[in-house]
């Protein structure tokens, strides 16, 4: 049964493990769950891990009582199937209470209140990215109702989490997160996730306009792509899954995702888990910030906010951006120094000789999650089953098709799961070739009509592959001054 406006759908759980005294037992210890998260390189769903969390009862109606009339900001978007993504800069915003949201969403006869200008059949509403520390600043006791420590992160709770409340059709445009990996607990209603692996980045046409620190957007509406404008998207390998109440989705580092609400009301809680790679990623983000702000401000100094995502409230002056970059570089070197000291302590304790210091610091070239031994990766994959369900490719079709809804992968009782593909996708240099493949002019006069905009230039300058190389060169160059 789908979750309606009032209640919460029954969680889709498989057979629970029962202890000697008949009490339910979680399928993974915190240590094992963390090991899986840190080694797994494809999205997966954890089942039977949150059945005792107090926050499993956090329906929108319950939260409206907890928040006691507190106003929150809702992003308002148009329902529709256009081929252009609805970025946050294209949406309007409403400040309202959860009670007012529920009245508009569930009692469409109401024509008063802050949502009165938004016809329910034409618009969706989304209270997204609501950080607990702000939303519950005077009710910090609720932090303890979210227990991420069950996944192997001691002390992690709601304080490091964000809340998402949406109506049917509410969605986030396709993007990747620059930092960390992601754990998402579905509380009420269902959400469909469209995911693409990091190696598909060239096929997703990445852009940093609108600019938001730590988010790389795709130019494509992945649920209705314009394949004439973005033909490479057909090569992207879509993974699709419907997340139901009681399930926790693990999204590995740098996996692209588009998320849409399928039920009248959806509530989700997530937490981004910090990773070793974030130290270099902060340098990349600081480089991106400086380049985007410099060029866009020079292009239109009188309207500096039009290219910024509404979530960006920081000053964008060159002085501030220079401070960001220098802070990120210093933090990277500080982290390396601490890591080196720990390594020396371990070597000393084991009676081993320390390695000879290289002249220049080597920066890891590979993208993707932390390097993990092949044995650990294979062990994580071997744990797939009713309590750890892999998110597999939606179909043999590529990005342009939407066949093979992943509800086949996650059944209503969580007991059935899709088979793993027999062979992993071969990771060749096709991504790089797609990025650099020249496009032939479409006609004899095509050259004279070409116009290169600032955004076109930025799409090249701050492409994730380019900023990674720039960050590596910067770190290697400054390492001469440091070591």
UniProtKB/Swiss-Prot annotation:
Q: Span of the secretion signal?
A: none
Region span, Disordered: 1-26, 388-416
Region (Interaction with HSPB1) residue ranges read 88-208
Statement: the UniProt record of this protein carries the keyword Oxidoreductase = no
Which of UniProt's keywords are assigned here? Cytoplasm
| Entry's localization field | Cytoplasm
The JmjC domain sits at 124-288
Please give the GO cellular component terms listed in this UniProt entry: cytoplasm
Instruction: Give yes or no: UniProt keyword Cytoplasm.
Output: yes
Function text: May play a role in cellular stress response.
What is its quaternary makeup?
Interacts with CRYAB and HSPB1.
Q: What is this protein called?
A: HSPB1-associated protein 1
Q: Which organism is it from?
A: Mus musculus (Mouse)
């Amino acid at each position: 049964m789908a979750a309606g406006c009032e209640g919460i759908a029954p969680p889709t759980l498989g057979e629970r493990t029962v202890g000697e005294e008949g009490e339910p037992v979680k399928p993974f210890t915190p240590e094992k769950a963390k090991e899986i998260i840190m080694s797994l390189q494809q999205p997966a769903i954890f089942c039977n891990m949150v059945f005792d969390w107090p926050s499993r009862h956090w329906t929108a109606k319950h939260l409206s009582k907890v928040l006691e009339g507190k106003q929150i900001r809702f992003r308002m978007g148009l329902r529709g199937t256009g081929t252009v993504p609805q970025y946050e800069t294209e949406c309007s915003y409403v400040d309202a209470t959860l009670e007012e949201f529920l009245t508009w969403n569930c009692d469409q006869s109401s024509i008063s209140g802050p949502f009165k200008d938004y016809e329910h059949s034409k618009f969706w509403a989304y209270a997204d990215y609501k950080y607990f520390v702000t939303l519950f600043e005077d009710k910090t006791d609720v932090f303890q109702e979210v227990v991420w420590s069950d996944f192997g992160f001691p002390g992690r709770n709601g304080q490091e989490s964000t809340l998402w409340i949406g109506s049917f059709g509410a969605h986030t445009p396709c993007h990747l997160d620059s930092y960390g990996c992601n754990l998402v607990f579905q509380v009420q209603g269902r959400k469909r996730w469209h995911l693409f692996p990091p190696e598909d980045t060239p096929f997703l046409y990445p852009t940093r306009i609108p600019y938001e620190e730590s988010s790389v957007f795709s130019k494509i509406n992945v649920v209705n792509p314009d394949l004439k404008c973005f033909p490479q998207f057909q090569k992207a390998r879509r993974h699709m899954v419907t997340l139901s109440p009681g399930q926790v989705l693990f999204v590995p580092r740098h996996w692209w995702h588009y998320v849409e609400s399928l039920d009248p009301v959806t509530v989700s809680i997530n937490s981004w888990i910090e990773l070793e790679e974030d130290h270099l990623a902060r340098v990349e983000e600081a480089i991106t910030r400086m380049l985007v702000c410099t060029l866009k401000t020079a292009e239109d100094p009188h309207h500096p906010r039009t290219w910024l995502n509404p979530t960006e409230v920081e000053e964008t002056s060159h002085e501030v951006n220079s401070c960001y970059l220098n802070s990120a570089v210093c933090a990277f070197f500080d982290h390396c120094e601490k890591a080196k000291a720990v390594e020396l302590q371990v070597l000393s304790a084991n009676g081993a000789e320390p390695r000879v210091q290289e002249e220049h610091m080597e920066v890891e070239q590979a993208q993707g999650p932390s390097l993990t031994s092949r044995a650990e990766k294979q062990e994580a994959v071997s744990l797939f089953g009713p309590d750890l369900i892999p998110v597999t490719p939606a179909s043999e079709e590529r990005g342009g098709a939407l066949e093979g809804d992943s509800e086949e992968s996650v059944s209503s009782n969580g007991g059935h799961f899709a088979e793993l593909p027999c062979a992993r996708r071969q990771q060749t240099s096709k991504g790089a070739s797609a990025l650099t493949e020249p496009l032939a002019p479409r006609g004899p006069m095509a050259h004279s009509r070409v116009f290169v905009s600032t955004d076109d230039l930025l799409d090249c300058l701050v492409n994730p592959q380019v900023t990674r190389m720039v960050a590596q060169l910067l770190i290697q160059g400054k390492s001469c001054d440091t070591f």
